[in-house]
Amino acid sequence: MKYSIPATPSGTTHAHVAIVGMGPRGTSALERLCASATDFLAPGARLTVHVVDPSPPGAGRVWRTAQSSELLMNTVTSQVTLYTDKSVVCSGPIREGPSLYEWATDAKLGLGPDEYPTRAQYGHYLEWVFREVVRNAPTGVEIEVHAARAVSLDDAPDGRQTLTLSTGRTLSGLSAVVLAQGHLPLVADAQLQQLTAYADQNGLRHITPSNPADVDLSSLKPGEPVFLRGLGLNFFDYMALLTTGRGGRFSRTPNGLRYHPSGREPRMYAGSRRGIPYQARGDNAKGAYGRHMPLIFTEEVIDGFRQRADSGNAPNFLKEIWPLVSKEVETVYYEALLRQHGFELGDFRDRFLATAHKSLEEAQVLTDFGITEENRWSWDRISRPYGERTFTAGAWRDWMLEYLREDAKEASLGNVNGPLKAALDVMRDLRNELRLIVDHAGLSGLSHRDHLDRWYTPLNAFLSIGPPRQRIEQMIALIEAGILDVLGPRPQARAEDGAWTVYSPEVPGLKVRVTTLIEARLPEPSLRHTADELLSHLLKTGQCRPHTVDGYETGGLDITLSPYRIIDSQGRAHERRFAVGVPTEGVHWVTAAGARPGVNSVTLSDTDAVARAALSAAVSGNTAVERQTEVKAWPNVEVSEVTVLEVGV
């Protein structure tokens, strides 16, 4: 069925735009569009916004309200919002609204400002925001919901857009289309296909990278040996679903948490390349708006890096940017350490910042302030705390429990007074500044690949966006209860005798045989390997292209600078198509992070820019030939021609 613009009274303008994806970013884009509509629409003009998502609008699929209450956000309630505030630098009007905490307080949900809400609770907030946006839409603006997937997008002869839905319905005559999708499925690579085929042939289970909320775990039997490959946020989701999600419970004792099994749990084994779980987030002591204000990453420094990148002399992340990140982190660590020991800070900050990273002068400053070698910051010790040791099975288990207990203890000291967690939280607080530097080809292709994608981004995730402290405490209790074991670094899963034998080369003698292998991670954004029909259609027809930096494909959908127009295979930016969010990862950095109040959230300024550009397209008239903008080509140095660096911390 084809849906086109209906007839309107003579002299009345009726424009149509579409937003594909109605999770947090799509909902934010809709809110921003409604906020700015009166800046663009003439008196009496009409605008219909078509929102396209098979899941309930607002929450979308990831944050849907019909998911297990065992699944938590990893951000405290007071630091989550979908509304602009006075801190947000954007062209559109500021329309303040409640944060998740303020909304939950009004709704009497009993959530404290520093508690971690469930994902379903956040979904309820998002659905409420969507309803409020619809209810308060300005005169002449109406929102039409399409519970469907978008499967293709094409130009009409008059330059407007035609969007085809999975229901067979076609929306034509669209003046603008905004893609605001979240995490999308991928076509499995050869290695994953091989594992799945082996599982099918032997009556095993292989669960590919997925959102745990989307996975049917009911076939896992009590006591069945299961290996979870990955110790990040997805691991903790599976851990919860397979324990308290099956009727087990935790109780508090003087010695910590104790787990009381239901008898329905599988026997879980876990591991990752690093061998240890993401570090617990420090208990929040910063309130809703508190953050580390950059000491080194000033506007002048950021502008300097950008000017170099824009002139074709992009900086090297490891050599030029990383030392500054490290200096910011270490400054906060040492100041908190000195306060913890009752020392006066005096001129410590000025002297420490005046020295070069890892220099003899820096070490002398630490000596002058009485900071011993034992208490000095070590990225090696933090990223690989077991060093080069190998362990027996029993020694590894004992070491792991002690490590987890220490991590929980450090987290309890908070992200202000606890030296370790205060320092690691700096990495989270600096995300906006780093985005300004590295986004849109801010690094060379080689540095983007080896230093950012393959090294710093995983390190940043491991250290600064981990689970709440309670998850680490639960993990300890599950190990003590014999429900869970961590196998060690660099685990290998070998197919043999109709099952998988899993072991770590660094814990000799510890081998387990499992019948279910769970890839405990989300699929990485990859335009070339996406299973999303809409993006696949655009790629196959040359209407979009993968983002590249000096020949290195980052995996993201290529877009321009703000307002993020989609670029086709010929390097032309489409005037009526825009994209924000996870599919653009690579062009932008850490796109999965949500909006936070009071800190000029880039998510909100991005959706504002896209919304206003879409409105501009809606009122610009319908030309027979759509104008497209040629995008500047960057110097193309093939990554294959450059020697790969081995990067350590």
UniProtKB/Swiss-Prot annotation:
UniProt keyword annotations, A-Z: Monooxygenase, NADP, Oxidoreductase
Cofactor requirements of the protein: FAD
Disruption phenotype: Completely abolishes the production of 3-nitropropanoic acid.
EC number: 1.14.13.248
Reactions the enzyme catalyzes: L-aspartate + 3 NADPH + 3 O2 + 2 H(+) = 2-nitrobutanedioate + 3 NADP(+) + 4 H2O
Gene Ontology MF, one: monooxygenase activity
Pathway: Mycotoxin biosynthesis
Record-linked SUPFAM superfamilies: FAD/NAD(P)-binding domain (SSF51905)
Superkingdom of the organism of origin: Eukaryota
Major enzyme class: oxidoreductase
UniProt key word Lipid metabolism: no
Pfam families documented for this protein: NAD_binding_9 (PF13454)
PANTHER family: BLR0577 PROTEIN
Family under the similarity heading: Belongs to the nitrosuccinic acid synthase family.
Biological role: Nitrosuccinic acid synthase; part of the gene cluster that mediates the biosynthesis of the deadly neurotoxic nitroalkane 3-nitropropanoic acid (3-NPA) that acts as an antimetabolite of succinate and irreversibly inhibits succinate dehydrogenase and disrupts mitochondrial oxidative phosphorylation. NpaA catalyzes the iterative oxidation of L-aspartic acid to nitrosuccinic acid (2-nitrobutanedioate). Alternative amino acid substrates such as L-glutamate and D-aspartate are not accepted by npaA as a substrate, showing the strict substrate specificity toward L-aspartate.
Protein name: Nitrosuccinic acid synthase npaA
